[in-house]
Structures are given as structure tokens and as C-alpha cells.
């Protein structure tokens, strides 16, 4: 049974404040504060350490390990599939290029066989209707052009005007030349109207038609009469295979005293006395600039 003093002392004890108790409680709070981070960091460190190696051996750690394993397995399978696709694509491209090359070689072989063989008019008509033969027609035209080009350049090349020194040389030039060679001889004398123009034209045409043999000779060298010299010059004689196929006297009557290479060329082409020339190899007389002769001061436009 409590006395009045106990009650008074007890109430005092309940409301009594001790500094030592406060210090003890502060120490406990600090200890708990220091221990909290250590305990909170433990689960994070227990999840994964290194590359996919779980430190936590509990159920959650086993599940995470399994998920990581399946993820790596899926990535590896996808990489293998991509590598397989790249390999298949590479092999298909190489096979396709090889097949294309064989097909192109076979096509060229077939075209060559067609070109080498003889074509009838019926076959030519059928090829015009067939789109696949368009390439063959182009190839055929190209080969024909090459053949014509070779025929054009076959035989000797002259490219200049030759001076005949004597009457005997005049006869040898006609008789001893190849039968396929076309020979044009300008008979001239200095001071005759049209002679200088003819000399300049011959120089230009000799460069344009290298397979044609252009020559000139004085009328006095071949023993022509004075009457022929006065009335027939300038004269142009054309021979082939030893035969006279063209004889034009007093050319100034047709071309005038002042004419150009293009005029003489057109005049000879009108009579069919000039061969076909390759337009791509030599510049046309119509587009030539200026022709100079060592023996003449005449300028040809």
C-alpha cells in the first residue's frame, strides 16, 4: 500500500528527465542509422555479380539465372540464323552470276553461228518480227561494217599526188599497177587557167581517198601536141585495170576556173568514179579546213 510519500515520489519519477538516458537513446539511434545502409545494400549485391553469375542461391536467384540463360540462348540462335541467311544469299548470288555468264556465252555463240551462216530473205523477215533477234541484227550489221572497212583498206595506200617524170613512167603507171587500183591522172601545164585549182583539189582528194592513186604529168612529157595543150587542159584521165574509164578534157568548162575539192568530188561522184569512203576515219572534204600544196600557193576552203 502506497503512502503519500511514495505517491509523490512515484509521480516525480514518472516525470523525471535524465540526461544519461537521453544519451543512451541517441547512441542506439546512431547505431541503427549506421546499420541500415549495410543491411539495405546486401540484397542488391546478392542479386548478380559478374556476367550472369548469381550470388543469391535462393529461388529468385535460380529463376534469374534461368531467364538469363534462355536470353543468351535465344540471342545465339538469332545470330546463327542471320549468319545462315548471309551465307545462303552469297551462294545464290555467286551461282546466279555464273549462270548469267554461261547464258551470255551461249548467246554470243549462237549469234556467231547465225552470222557465219547464210541467211535467206525469209529468215531476215522472221528476224524483223522477233524481238529476240534484235541483238543479232545489230551484231550482223557490226560485222558487215567491219568487213567493208577491211575491204576499203585492202591494197596499197597512197595519200599523196605523185609526179610522173616521163612518158615511159606514164605507161608503167597504167600497166603495172594492181587491177583493183583506181588511177587518176591530171595532165597539166603551168599558166593554163584552172591548173592551180586542179592541183589543190587533187591534194585534198588524195588525203580523203588513200586507196586511189592520184598522179599528175606535164603534157610536154608525154608528147602531147601544142593544140592539145591549148584546147584540152586541164585534163583528167581515169584508169582501172589498164583501161581508160574516164576522160575529161578542159575541166574548167564544167567547174569553172576557180573551183574547190568539194566541187571536183561531187563531179566525179556523179559519174560513179570515186569509191565509197569511210566517213568515220577521215574528215569529209566538205568539212576540211585548208589544204596547202608545196607546189602551189592555192588555199582550199
Curated annotation (Swiss-Prot):
UniProt keywords, alphabetically: Acetylation, Cell projection, Chaperone, Cilium biogenesis/degradation, Phosphoprotein, Sensory transduction, Vision
Region (Thioredoxin fold): 158-301
Annotated spans, Disordered: 15-60
Entry-linked CDD domains: Phd_like_Phd (cd02987)
KW Magnesium (keyword) present: no
GO molecular function, one term: protein-containing complex binding
Name this protein carries in UniProt: Phosducin-like protein
Organism annotation: Rattus norvegicus (Rat)
Gene coding for it: Pdcl
